């Protein structure tokens, strides 16, 4: 019985050593292997906090829109658009409004924010400063009361303009 078990074990060991594994068929010469990875885009944008405008102030700092951090593809950018009706609405009387405008300053360029406005950022640290503007005539015409408006900041990952 020992001889049969010994022969079986020797046979199993000999057959195991005869197995060769191949990862790639190698015809000779050189072969290339490609290594790939994907790095997903990431970014963080800061927008202005809630702001109170003092009565009779013609210009109030609204804060800034800032691209705090960014890992973008070379041909991409982060775009921020602003939606508002640009009217401060009286909390009691919907007909009573105080019109206002927003001014965006990017470096030395200043423009009035409207429906077509878009700030485009490509590098972390870029920012656009915003100001709220109300004319003295609009303050003088305002009824007493509390006023508010909501400004919506839309943030998108877009193709960069060349």
Regions inferred by a protein language model and the residue ranges of each:
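N-terminal small/polar-rich segments of proteins
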Residues: 22-96, 116-162
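Aromatic-residue detector
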Residues: 4-7, 69, 100-102, 147-149
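Sec-dependent N-terminal signal peptides of Gram-positive bacterial secreted proteins and lipoproteins
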Residues: 2-23
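Extracellular/luminal ectodomains and secreted, surface-exposed scaffolds of diverse proteins
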Residues: 94-117
């Amino acid at each position: 019985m020992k001889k049969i078990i010994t022969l079986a074990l020797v046979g199993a060991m000999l057959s195991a050593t005869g197995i060769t594994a191949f990862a790639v068929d190698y015809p000779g010469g050189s072969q290339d292997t490609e290594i790939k990875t994907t790095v997903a885009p990431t970014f963080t944008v800061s927008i202005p906090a809630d702001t109170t405008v003092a009565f009779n102030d013609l210009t109030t700092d609204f804060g800034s829109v800032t691209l705090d951090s960014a890992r973008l593809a070379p041909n991409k950018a982060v775009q921020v658009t602003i939606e508002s009706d640009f009217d401060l609405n009286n909390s009691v009387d919907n007909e009573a409004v105080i019109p206002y405008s927003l001014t965006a300053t990017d470096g030395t360029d200043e423009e009035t924010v409207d429906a077509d406005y878009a700030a485009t950022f490509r590098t972390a640290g870029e920012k656009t400063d915003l100001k709220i503007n109300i004319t003295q005539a609009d303050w003088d015409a305002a009824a007493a009361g509390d006023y508010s408006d909501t400004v919506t900041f839309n943030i998108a990952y877009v193709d960069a303009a060349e």
